Amino acid sequence: MHFSKAVVKFRIPIIIIALVLLVPSLFGMMATRINYDMLDYLPGDMDTVVGQEELLEDFGKGAFSFIVVEDMEPKDVKTLCSEIEKVDHVETVLSWASLADVSVPMEILPDEIYREFNTENSTLVAVFFDSATSADVTMDAIRSIRSICGKQCFVSGMSALVTDLKDLCEKEEPIYVAIAVVLATVAMLIFLDSWLVPFVFLASIGMMILLNLGTNYFMGEISYITKALASVLQLAVTMDYSIFLWHSYNEKRSEYSDNKEAMAHAISETLTSVVGSSLTTVAGFIALCFMSFTLGRDLGIVMAKGVVLGVIGCVTVLPSLILLFDKPLQKAKHKSLIPDMTKFAGGVVKVFPVFIVVFVALVAPALYGYNQTNDEVYYDMGECLPEDMEYVIANSKLSEEFDLASTHMLLVDANLAPKDVKSMIKEMNAVDGVKYTLGLESIVGSGVPEEFLPESVTEILQSDKWKLLVINSEYKVASDAVNEQIDQLNTILKKYDSKGMLIGEAPCMKDMIETTDHDFQVVNAISIVAIFLIIAVVEKSISLPFILIAVIELAIFINLGLPHYLGQSLPFIAPICISTIQLGATVDYAILMTTRYKAERLAGSDKRASVSTALATSIPSIIVSGMGLFAATFGVAVYSDIDIISSMCMLMARGAIVSMLCVIFILPALLMLCDKLVCRTTLGMAHLSKKNKSKSEVK
């Protein structure tokens, strides 16, 4: 109570401090760099990551793009290349014309090289940058190149992808927050008992969201996914805590004549309840931090921090605001639109065997769909973008006109004998889907003496430490075909140079697939175990964690199984994140009902009356909480043109509804079925089991 009384006493200073903290938070939020490159989150010790660093360090080359130039004369292409070379951070521009010095007749260059760079109406230009794929300066360079090239040119590559992604995110993100706020407000206006309190909630939660976004500055940078989802998720998840305080305060007002004393008791009650409840949510987010694909750590830390700040705001800023606006809040109260649920709850409990059958019947198809969905995810980030984006159009041109879907790069020892390199190139060219392997050795020896090659070309393909070879592939990034191709190329490479490295977007994506497959198992296990232990401690029971997690896991299986049955493919990160977010965020519904059920049983009610009362009293809170999460995420899912954001928000929205329905219909049935087991395995309830037994013996 000391803390609660202090909050009430210092309510005005608390509001002033919160408002003052918004200023540095705003600056911190604006200064936090946003990372749009998924490949940056791969473990740093992987060959693909090490190879990218070597390429940048030894050749001064980081990002790489192909430009498709249509209907342009060779002399104009040459002029265009000269203009592109002047762009800041463009390291090298490689085209058909640049492969030979002007004094060397083009006729003596291999036909394969000509075909690689030219079709009937198009020319291919390769651009190397001296900065990393997702560096701000690289994205600026991409924009400059596009402005120079005009409508006849199409810029592809990962840097073009992250540039388009950044531009689209910056355009959409403010609208995400606006949609979430408007729809969450509508949900609260409908389901709460005051026309004014939703706006007080939003003020308190909004301050905590800004503090969370501002403190991200100390992380250095966050991913665009984290930035897009953080505000929406924090609003949806921490809304529950505000609702709990408001309900508690209204109850205490009827017990105490002084509203300040009522608030002090409400804060104490809320703190006890909300800390236990928030632990499951925090555990779900912290589980993401155990991913070796460090995007999970990024999202996990930011969201766990947001939940903690949400709890702090709920017991400090929110009570201060409620007391400040108490009179208008009380005047704006109205009767709740949610009817009395006693009769409905009695009906659900009466037919509980039906819901046991439903539970058993749903497990197999839900689990099958869930496993299939996990197998059908996509990893190509280009699929996240709308079809009219410049990157997507450029990739289509590259595929249609040059039959080119992905580009790999090889780094081999500079001292590797030319004959071995030629032999390796020959073997690699024989691999299915490889169009051509370009290196010094594929030019030299085809009628072109090495000394005839311009220095600009030899510098691109060889340094003191490494030889660089470029492999063009017909196979799409992240496809099974390209992954098998990469395995074959790596086998050939290691035969000639055990320290050689195969790098590029497709090899990185293959590493990402293998990394996230492992992460999925780890994160799921950690989140389930952590939440199991928290429920076991909170409920002082061994059996209840199994029952509660079974209910929410079924909801997760249904939610993530539906995309398979609907013929939808999800971005790879969605199932990993959603399974933990849904478990952590919605298991609170089950804990709320179970806690009331225990209290009723300990008060002497039989199992039917206990479950009915628990269900009837919990439904309003579960509906408000579930609809709040649904409202905050559904609008964003419908609006967003970025599939990874849209998919994750749709899964969260649907997950809230599915979890809500499972808790309302299936959890009561399981509590009825397992009542004896619960009593025997829950601290302080064993005597109820004996009591039931003695009653049955008397009968």
Residue ranges and their predicted role:
Residues 1-34, 133-376, 477, 494-699:
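Membrane-embedded transmembrane helical bundles of large multi-pass transporters/channels
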Residues 44-65, 69-162, 371-378, 382-544, ...:
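Structured non-transmembrane domains adjacent to transmembrane bundles in polytopic membrane proteins
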